[in-house]
């Protein structure tokens, strides 16, 4: 596929232009075979044309300009914190933390955020330090290169005049390197955007003491509107106030650079200055999943180049999801910065090591103990809504993907329950998933297509912006999950379609540096610990709403990796799951009370942006969905919410208070609004499945009782709803199992230990999707507490000895 990529690109772009020129709709694309699966070698033209603008969204995505210094055919990132930089003339919203950088027609504006909006939802970007040049008028900003959490771009005027800028997430520093430009520095006005400050900045030396310009040397500090910056330069540099009020920078030799550091205070300049002269040229996150220890070990590597002889190491900051639960020695004795993601603690160096526990994930739960009436209820739901229904499955990648995972869950429940509906459900799942994972020329929907310019697989029909890679991990995680489960249930599916399913997984989570077909970790921000949803980015950065679906995409990777025997895929899934689940807790729910700004009046948020938090969603202001979208889809992968004792109950109590207040407010605001009770029944079937699916990780017995009550109510449309089949089963299983015992782990990533809070009984559970029996050992710390022999293609459970 890699060798043929150039030929496919030439053919496709030619046929795109001809098709558009003639105004025809072309649906034929070549078939690219992968095992028994396949995909279309090019995206469909004419399928997604806006009725008003007549713009074809697919052609626009493939054909839009990407701002690069050199386009060597490398896979172009999408969904990144710097995405706007790749796709706009002047990239903005580059939140490196604790600062934001905007490229402008004058150079760059550096906003050092030190406070929040009055309601606590935004990190304020005010009074920037501006880096430009004498008569410097860049025509655009162009990406020069990127690492796992760094990006370099060129503020470009001509081949002989430019400024290269390097940014790194968590690096409170901006590196500027000049060619043919005499630098100028000045203080911007309140909102930046080319405005000038009304007040004159103050200046200080590397020792933090005031100085008066002109100054000659290697360091100058600037204090403006409560913000302190350290400016490091080559020896012999002169800083002087010019006739226009800007600071003229004159280097003693050819070329030159300026390094701008954010400082908590003047006294911190010396520390930053010492580390300013090593510019990061690449960053890499390396990881190892230790099955025996139940640990994820990561190494954060910063490759630097010296701007002066002997310089090495950078100041690197880390956020709460990284340092709070870290088991390695990590010296974070440098400056600290308050951010909208909590305290960023800094250390200095080129390599930083961490270790975090991973206690397993399961695709479902086994039949344990007395399942009560749940088995009978589930049997009826499986028969009515899955085995005997003629209702078609979704035709776009979001709803089609969700349906596939629901069917996979239903098939798994049927297998565990020994229910007679298994065969019919499994057959329908296989038929539909196989259809999605293969392409037939001329078909209108349910296939994947290759974007040769942007390098990625997009499913059609697309939905919610997925044609430009928005929500890619949400959608495609469902397919990967379904493929993993079906690989267990159907002995031939993995050999036939496993390679194609793995290709879909790589599209959103490419973990292999050697596989250049896709950008690395397309949707994941390794430093922030969570994914970003938008493929194009915005002027304010990027965002993510549904943490539940993001976590699900990583759980799916673990499951498919185990089903295919691909340890690298599994390890990547563990890495993503460990960090995304921690980030979901920390930054959407603030369980420790030290992340949300003090003025923020809610206990959770529905969405986060690069520099802000949002009480809301893209589609509603109702708390039922602000909370609920974080719990989509229900399943064992959400068990991480139980890591913090009492968090599930505390969070749900917060939801109920918010929903009650919302109902009161809407009733007063809108005459036509009918106030709804804050009950499970009022949520409807699908949404209720997410709420109950979350609550069962806190008090499964209570959820089971509520389901029984709803089931017995005449005309019930919630407990009888198709979305509830797996919730009935899993809640009943958890009623017997209890909650995850976070002290314990198994030697398989698809195993867990549960402990019942009342009986004290602990139970080991393990999944084996393979063709041979597996033995899984279980440990509490380093003490072995039992083992399970798991038959092929099954799930097993047993009591801890």
Predicted regions and their residues:
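Short secondary-structure subsegments characteristic of cysteine-rich extracellular domains
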Residues: 499-508, 569-580, 584
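Alpha-helical scaffolds that organize eukaryotic protein assemblies
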Residues: 485, 495-502, 506-524, 559
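Active-site neighborhood of glycoside hydrolase catalytic domains
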Residues: 547-580
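Active-site rim elements
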Residues: 540-544
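Ser/Thr/Asn(+Pro)-rich, low-complexity disordered segments
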Residues: 29-471, 511-515, 519-520, 524-527, ...
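Short, Lys/Arg-enriched N-terminal segments with co-localized hydrophobic residues
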Residues: 1-6
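Bacterial N-terminal signal peptides
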Residues: 13-24
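Aromatic-rich carbohydrate-recognition surfaces in CAZymes
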Residues: 394-414, 425, 466-505, 546-554
């Amino acid at each position: 596929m890699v060798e043929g990529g150039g030929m496919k690109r030439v053919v496709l772009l030619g046929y795109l232009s001809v098709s558009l020129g003639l105004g025809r709709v072309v649906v034929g694309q070549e078939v690219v075979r992968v095992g028994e699966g396949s995909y279309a070698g090019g995206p469909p033209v004419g399928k997604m044309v806006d009725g008003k603008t007549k713009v074809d969204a697919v052609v626009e995505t493939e054909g839009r300009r990407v701002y690069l210094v050199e386009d060597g055919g490398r896979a172009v990132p999408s969904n990144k914190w710097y995405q706007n930089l790749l796709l706009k003339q002047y990239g903005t919203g580059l939140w490196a933390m604790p600062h934001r950088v905007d490229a402008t027609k004058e150079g760059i504006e550096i906003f050092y955020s030190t406070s929040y909006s009055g309601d606590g939802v935004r990190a304020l970007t005010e009074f920037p330090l501006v880096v430009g040049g004498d008569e410097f008028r860049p025509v655009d900003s162009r990406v020069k290169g990127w690492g796992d959490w760094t990006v370099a771009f060129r503020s470009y005027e001509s081949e002989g005049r430019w400024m290269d800028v390097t940014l790194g997430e968590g690096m409170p520093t901006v590196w500027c390197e000049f060619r043919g430009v005499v630098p100028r520095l000045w203080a911007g006005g309140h909102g930046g955007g080319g405005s000038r400050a009304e007040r004159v900045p103050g200046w200080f030396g590397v020792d933090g003491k005031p100085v008066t310009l002109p100054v000659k040397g290697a360091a100058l500090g600037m204090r403006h509107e409560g913000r302190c910056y350290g400016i490091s330069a080559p020896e012999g540099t002169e800083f002087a106030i010019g006739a226009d009020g800007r600071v003229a920078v004159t280097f003693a030799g050819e070329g030159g650079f300026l390094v701008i550091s954010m400082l908590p205070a003047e006294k911190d300049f010396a520390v930053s200055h010492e580390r300013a002269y090593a510019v990061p040229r690449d960053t890499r996150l390396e990881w190892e999943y230790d099955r025996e220890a139940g640990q994820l070990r990561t190494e954060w590597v910063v490759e630097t180049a010296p701007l002066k002889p002997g310089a090495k190491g950078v100041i690197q900051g880390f956020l709460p999801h990284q340092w709070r639960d870290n088991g390695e020695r990590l010296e974070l004795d440098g400056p600290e910065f308050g951010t909208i993601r909590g305290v960023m603690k800094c250390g200095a160096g080129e390599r930083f090591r961490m270790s975090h526990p991973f206690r397993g994930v399961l695709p479902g739960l086994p039949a344990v103990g007395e399942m009560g009436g749940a088995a009978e209820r589930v049997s009826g739901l499986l028969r009515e809504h899955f085995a005997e229904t003629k209702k078609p499955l979704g035709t776009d990648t979001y709803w089609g993907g969700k349906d596939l995972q629901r069917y996979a869950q239903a098939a798994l429940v049927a297998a565990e329950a020994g229910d007679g509906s298994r065969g019919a459900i499994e057959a329908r799942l296989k038929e539909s998933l196989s259809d999605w994972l293969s392409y037939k020329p001329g078909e209108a929907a349910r296939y994947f297509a290759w974007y040769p310019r942007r390098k990625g697989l997009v499913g059609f029909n697309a939905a919610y912006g997925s044609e430009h890679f928005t929500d890619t991990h949400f959608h495609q995680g469902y397919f990967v999950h379904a493929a993993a489960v079906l690989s267990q249930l159907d002995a031939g599916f993995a050999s036939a379609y496993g390679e194609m399913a793995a290709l879909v997984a790589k599209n959103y989570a490419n973990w292999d540096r050697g596989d250049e077909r896709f950008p690395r970790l397309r949707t994941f921000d390794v430093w922030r610990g969570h994914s970003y949803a938008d493929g194009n980015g915005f002027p304010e950065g990027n965002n993510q709403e549904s943490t539940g679906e993001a976590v699900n995409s990583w759980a799916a990777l673990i499951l498919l990796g185990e089903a295919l025997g691909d340890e690298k895929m599994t390890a990547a899934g563990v890495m993503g799951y460990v960090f995304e689940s921690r980030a979901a807790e920390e930054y959407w729910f603030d369980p420790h009370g030290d992340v949300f700004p003090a003025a923020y009046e809610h206990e959770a948020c529905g969405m986060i942006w690069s520099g802000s938090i949002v009480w809301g969603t893209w589609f509603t202001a109702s708390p039922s969905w602000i909370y609920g979208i974080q719990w989509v889809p229900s399943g064992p992968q959400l068990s991480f919410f139980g890591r913090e004792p009492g968090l599930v109950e505390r969070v749900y109590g917060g939801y109920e208070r918010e929903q009650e207040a919302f109902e009161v407010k809407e009733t007063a605001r809108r005459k036509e609004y009918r106030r709804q009770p804050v009950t499970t029944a009022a949520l409807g079937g699908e949404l209720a499945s997410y709420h109950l699916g979350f609550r069962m990780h806190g008090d499964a017995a209570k959820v089971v009782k509520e389901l029984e009550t709803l089931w017995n109510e005449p005309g019930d449309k919630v407990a009888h709803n198709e979305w509830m089949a797996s919730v009935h089963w899993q809640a009943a299983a958890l009623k017997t199992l209890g909650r995850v015992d976070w002290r314990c782990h198994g030697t398989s990533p698809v195993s867990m230990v549960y402990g019942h809070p009342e009986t004290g009984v602990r139970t080991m559970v393990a999944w084996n999707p393979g063709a041979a029996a597996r033995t899984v050992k279980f440990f509490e710390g380093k003490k072995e507490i039992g083992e399970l022999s798991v038959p092929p293609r099954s799930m097993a459970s047993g009591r801890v000895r």
